[in-house]
Amino acid sequence: MKIICSKNSLLKSVSISLKAVPSKTTMPILECILIDATTNQIKFTTNDMELGIETIVEGTIEEKGMIALDAKILYEIIRRLPDNDVTIKTDDKLTAVITCEKAKFTIPGKSGEDFAYLPIIEREECLTVSQFTLKEMIRQTIFSIAANETNKLMTGELFEIKDNCLK
């Protein structure tokens, strides 16, 4: 695999994806971010078996492929790179070489096949809501969400779509 992306788009996607990386786990693959460049877009995926995040990164795919890299190490490397295009290249031994200008990092990876993929959600009903409206809906109801996870049922919000109306 070989991809080229701007540092800023990589950093943004990795920092968003880090929110679904568990701090402690018995499954080391969950500490990784899956870089999937097997289609015509570059996807970054993380999953802690409760929360999964997938982001799409703008960039160029020169060679298709997939690899799972330690998310925190990848974040620290990208954060310290100069503001320029970053190249991530992998080999058959699952080693990733990250280069940007004169900087070059080599980190071990894991097979993307071992990664816990996100479930495919079939959409029965769809509704488009503006970002502002959704933010306001959440702002007006967030006070009722439990602050701790002792009662998991109370840590989220319920959205219902009926007759093309979101409640």
Regions found by a protein language model. Name each.
Residues M1-K167:
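Structural preference for solvent-exposed beta-strand-turn elements
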